[in-house]
Amino acid sequence: MAVPKRRMSRANTRSRRAQWKAEKTELVGVTVAGQRHKVPRRLLKAARLGLIDLDRR
């Protein structure tokens, strides 16, 4: 594992960390039992198989 040679200042550390941003999950439309729902892509198959309750929010 890489070890820093010198201590990094608090300002530099925080400005570096501020560059990272979380991305919103992309929602995909799916029709289940005649109703249209928007779910994340990773839950698409589970929604089609009825493994998750889409009516509960």
UniProtKB/Swiss-Prot annotation:
Residues 1-19 have a biased composition (Basic residues). InterPro entries: Ribosomal_bL32, Ribosomal_zn-bd. Residues 1-20 are annotated as: Disordered. SUPFAM superfamilies: Zn-binding ribosomal proteins. The keyword Ribonucleoprotein applies. One of its GO terms (biological process) is translation. It holds the Pfam family Ribosomal_L32p. The keyword Ribosomal protein applies. One of its GO terms (molecular function) is structural constituent of ribosome. It comes from the Bacteria. One of its GO terms (cellular component) is large ribosomal subunit. Keywords: Ribonucleoprotein, Ribosomal protein. Belongs to the bacterial ribosomal protein bL32 family. This is Large ribosomal subunit protein bL32. The lineage of its organism: Bacteria, Bacillati, Actinomycetota, Actinomycetes, Mycobacteriales.
